């Protein structure tokens, strides 16, 4: 009998003023505080993209941060979430900034 909570994975892309405002560093800190794993990186088109994995309620907390909070100097216009699915195990051991 397993009491493990289901794990979720979701991809995201954040639009707005999200580069040059320490967004990735704050995202990494927030993910570690919440307890999710995955990654974040800048794109060549001025957005921030990545993936979040963890228990559903923690992933939902990170989704809220990515769409409403961000770093202090950022301005989030919108956040697109895609490929949301249930996973059997985490694919990452931590949350990291990619370059």
From Swiss-Prot:
The modification Phosphoserine is found at residue 93. Disulfide bonds: none annotated. The keyword Magnesium does not apply. Pfam families: Acylphosphatase. The keyword Isomerase does not apply. It catalyses: an acyl phosphate + H2O = a carboxylate + phosphate + H(+). Keywords: Acetylation, Glutathionylation, Hydrolase, Phosphoprotein. Its EC number is 3.6.1.7. It is an enzyme of class 3 (hydrolase). Residues 9-99 form the Acylphosphatase-like domain. The active site is at residues 24, 42. One of its GO terms (molecular function) is acylphosphatase activity. The modification N-acetylserine is found at residue 2. It comes from the Eukaryota. The modification S-glutathionyl cysteine is found at residue 22. Coiled coil: none annotated. Its physiological role is not yet clear. Belongs to the acylphosphatase family. This is Acylphosphatase-2. The gene is ACYP2.
């Amino acid at each position: 009998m397993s009491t493990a909570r289901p794990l979720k994975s979701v991809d995201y892309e954040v639009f707005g003023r999200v580069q040059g405002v320490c967004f990735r560093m704050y995202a990494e800190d927030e993910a570690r505080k919440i307890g999710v794993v995955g990654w974040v990186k800048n794109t060549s088109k001025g957005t921030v993209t990545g993936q979040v994995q963890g228990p559903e309620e923690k992933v939902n907390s990170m989704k809220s941060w990515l769409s409403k909070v961000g770093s202090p100097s950022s301005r989030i216009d919108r956040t697109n979430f895609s490929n949301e699915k249930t996973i059997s195990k985490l694919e990452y051991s931590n949350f990291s900034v990619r370059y």
